[in-house]
Amino acid sequence: VQMKGITKVYPNGVAANQGVDFFLRRGEIHALMGENGAGKSTLMKMLFGLEQPTSGEIWVNGEKLSLTSPTVAISHGIGMVHQHFMLVPSLTVAENMVLGMAPRKGLFIDHAKAVAITKEYAEKYNLHVEPEAKVMDIPVGMKQKVEILKALVRGAKILILDEPTAVLTTQETVELFKELRNLKEQGYTIVFISHKLNEIMEITDRLTIMRG
């Protein structure tokens, strides 16, 4: 991934990013660090198609892209796990996993197939989840695993994690780091947005610092 000269100015004149260059190597865990308001999340929202740059270019795998929506970003193998999870609490883990791409039996989600897909991906990536549990009933660490699996099942090869340890216990953070190392070994590329230097030093290969 190459982001060249990225500028984002909102209609009210506030500049979130000005002339930012960001380079991401395949198969690395790359930290994006900076104080609140430095534009870290905004930059990654542009890579995920949630926002569009005012100017600048985004290249992925040698191709210049116009990432006009998350759907476009996902089609190019980019996934994002937000700080505030985007799961439907009243649905099961399996139903959340296939939401929007659900295997169907007539008008209804094919629940057995959704469970099978969830189990397959959970095993493949060593991310333990409970497919039949309602999201409202599972702990925060497992919700995060569901979000990661959701991105992977949609074909993400580049995974953006926005402040992923902010809501986790110490033990859940240890588990997350183990899972991220496992994904890296399988060739995935990870952006780790954080301001916790001790975590960055432990888990990441390279670091980009953004100043406000």
Language-model-derived ranges and their functions:
Residues 1-212:
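Glycine-rich phosphate-binding loops of nucleotide-dependent enzymes
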